[in-house]
């Protein structure tokens, strides 16, 4: 039976944590959202793209996955963020549109943000996330997977929930070369740690409230009325006021993280299959609890966590 302390791969829910790292650097005066990213990654061959555009998926850049699939010679060797940047330099794929001329959700934006965090902070992305974010709010079970650079390992990480592909029979999800790209995915965490992050947002423990609020502002003013807008690492619901969320899917895992501020509700769902609840069913859970979950609902020690956060000298804030 799974519990709140079991660790899963978050897939694209990782993006909200990458965005938080960027906001932390901005709050310290180290990063300007509207500066060209070539001022941070000077070798990057596309000008006119800002950190803000990466955060809101408005860069227009084409998918790195397509580049790697076409040109990476040995799929047993990890493809890293540095390799990704090198491939954009080498092959210069045509962007989908000019910077800030549209919205296109793409993993490349958040993979580049991880590289931005590294260049600005002087730390590796996994180290920055651990030392500056996870440790700061006692997310003790959370980490960024750092794949060995030489060859693929056969499985994921010990003590983490194994992912599965649901075909005729469940098949273990194997490690693969794109798992070395960080920022867009490949963060591991559990329900309790993720709830700590949600409370840390409420109490302004990572960035001031004025900066945190920018994460929940629509990044595309002329966005389709039929789709939910996107802020900094969060989707913004068009159906529910003051409701923000993100889905995740990647190689044997699905995830969903939602905060409903008006009703003071948080919904965190982590699964270890690539096929499980649909996006519609996620929303049904929030709206009317129409979906039955097995084995049972889990009670999170909300009061205990909130009380620990309220008092900064408690053990919760220990590094």
What do the PLM-derived regions correspond to, one by one?
Residues 1, 233-235, 267-268:
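A short, well-structured edge-of-sheet supersecondary motif
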Residues 1-8, 30-34, 241:
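Short, conserved catalytic-motif segment at the N-terminal edge
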Residues 18:
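Active/ligand-binding-proximal structured segments within catalytic/core domains
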Residues 32-47, 136-137:
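Short, glycine/proline-biased beta-turn/loop segments that scaffold the active-site neighborhood
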Residues 48-249:
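Short, surface-exposed loop or secondary-structure junction motifs
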Residues 228, 240, 275-319:
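Short, gly/Ser/Thr-rich active-site loops of penicillin-recognizing serine hydrolases
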Residues 252-253:
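Short, small/polar residue-rich loop motifs at catalytic or cofactor-binding pockets
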Residues 256-274:
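Short, well-ordered beta-strand elements
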């Amino acid at each position: 039976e799974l519990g709140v302390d079991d660790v899963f791969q978050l897939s694209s829910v990782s993006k909200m944590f990458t965005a938080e790292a960027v906001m932390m650097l901005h709050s310290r005066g180290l990063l300007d959202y509207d500066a060209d990213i070539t001022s941070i990654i000077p070798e990057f061959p596309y000008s006119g793209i800002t950190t803000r555009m990466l955060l809101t998926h408005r860069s227009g850049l084409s998918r790195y996955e397509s580049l790697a699939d076409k040109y990476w010679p040995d799929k047993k060797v990890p493809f890293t963020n540095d390799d990704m940047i090198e491939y954009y330099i080498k092959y210069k794929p045509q962007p989908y549109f000019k910077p800030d001329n549209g919205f296109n959700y793409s993993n490349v934006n958040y993979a580049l943000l991880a590289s931005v965090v590294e260049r600005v902070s002087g730390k590796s992305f996994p180290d920055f996330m651990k030392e500056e974010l996870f440790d700061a709010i006692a997310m003790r079970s959370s980490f960024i997977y750092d794949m060995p650079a030489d060859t693929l390992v056969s499985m994921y990480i010990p003590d983490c929930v194994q992912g599965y592909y649901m075909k005729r029979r469940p098949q273990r999800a194997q490690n693969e070369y794109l798992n070395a790209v960080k920022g867009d995915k490949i963060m591991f965490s559990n329900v309790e740690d993720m709830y700590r992050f949600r409370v840390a947002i409420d109490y302004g423990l990572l960035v001031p409230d004025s900066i945190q609020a920018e994460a929940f502002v629509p990044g595309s003013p002329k966005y389709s009325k039929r789709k939910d807008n996107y802020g900094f690492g969060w989707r913004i619901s068009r159906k529910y006021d003051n409701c923000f969320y993100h889905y995740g899917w990647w190689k044997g895992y699905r995830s969903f993280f939602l905060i409903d501020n008006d009703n003071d509700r948080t919904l965190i769902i982590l699964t270890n299959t690539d096929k499980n609840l649909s996006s519609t069913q996620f929303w049904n859970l929030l709206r009317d609890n129409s979906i039955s979950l097995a084995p049972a609902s889990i009670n999170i020690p909300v009061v205990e966590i909130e009380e620990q956060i309220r008092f900064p000298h408690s053990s919760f804030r220990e590094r």
